[in-house]
C-alpha cells in the first residue's frame, strides 16, 4: 500500500518467503585421480616444451599435483562438470561447448530452467503462476538478449524478467530485488535463478587455482 499513513496507524508488512528451491547437477564427474592424471600430463608437456628456459633459470618448472595435495588444500574429492573431455585433455584443459543456433535455448538458460522446474515443483506452483524471473549470474553467457526471457518461455511464465550481474553476490542481490518486488506489490511470485558454469571460470592449468 502506498501513500501517507495517518497518525497512529501501522503499515502492514507483506511477508516474503522462499517457498521452493531447485538444484541443477551437471551430468559428468571428474575425480581427483582423473584430474591429477590430466594435469600432470600437461605439466610434463609444458616442462618439456620449455626445457631450455627452465635449465637457464629464466622460467620455473611446473610442479605436478597429487590426489593428497588437492584433498588437503580443498577437501574436494570430485566435481560435476558439463563437459569432461575438454577439461581432461592435457593440450587444452578447459571445457568444450558447442555453439547453439538461435532457435535453440541457450546452455545457461537450459540449466536455469531445469533448476527452476525443480523449485516450482517443490513450491507446488506452475510456471504460469510466476510473474517475474530474475536471472542472476557472476559470468553471463551473453550480454543480451536477457536469458531471463528464455527461462520465462521454457517454464511458461509471464510477467517480466531481466538479468543481473553483481559478480559473486549476484544471487543475494537478486533475492533482495525479488523480496522488494513482492513487498512493493509489483509481483506476487518471483523466480530467482543463479546459473553458473564454474568449470569455464577455472584455470585448470594452475595447480593452486
Question: Which residues are covered by each model-predicted region?
Answer:
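Conserved "HGTGT" condensation-loop signature of ketosynthase/thiolase-family condensing enzymes
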Residues: 6-129, 155-156
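Acyl-thioester C-C bond-transforming condensing/cleaving domain
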Residues: 6-12, 44, 106, 117, ...
Amino acid at each position: 500500500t502506498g501513500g501517507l499513513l495517518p497518525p497512529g496507524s501501522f503499515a502492514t508488512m507483506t511477508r516474503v518467503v522462499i517457498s521452493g528451491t531447485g538444484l541443477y547437477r551437471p551430468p559428468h564427474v571428474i575425480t581427483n585421480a582423473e584430474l591429477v592424471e590430466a594435469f600432470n600430463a600437461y605439466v610434463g608437456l609444458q616442462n618439456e616444451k620449455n626445457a631450455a628456459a627452465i635449465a637457464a633459470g629464466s622460467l620455473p618448472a611446473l610442479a605436478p599435483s597429487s590426489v593428497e595435495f588437492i584433498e588437503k588444500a580443498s577437501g574436494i574429492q570430485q566435481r560435476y562438470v558439463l563437459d569432461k573431455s575438454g577439461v581432461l585433455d592435457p593440450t587444452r584443459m578447459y571445457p568444450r561447448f558447442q555453439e547453439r543456433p538461435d532457435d535453440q535455448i541457450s546452455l545457461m538458460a537450459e540449466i536455469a530452467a531445469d533448476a527452476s522446474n525443480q523449485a516450482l515443483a517443490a513450491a507446488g506452483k506452475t510456471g504460469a503462476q510466476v510473474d517475474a524471473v530474475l536471472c542472476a549470474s557472476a559470468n553471463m553467457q551473453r550480454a543480451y538478449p536477457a536469458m531471463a526471457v528464455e527461462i520465462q518461455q521454457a517454464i511458461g511464465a509471464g510477467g517480466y524478467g531481466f538479468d543481473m550481474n553483481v559478480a559473486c553476490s549476484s544471487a543475494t542481490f537478486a533475492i533482495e530485488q525479488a523480496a522488494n518486488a513482492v513487498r512493493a506489490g509489483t509481483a506476487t511470485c518471483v523466480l530467482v535463478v543463479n546459473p553458473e558454469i564454474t568449470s569455464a571460470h577455472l584455470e585448470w592449468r594452475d595447480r593452486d587455482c
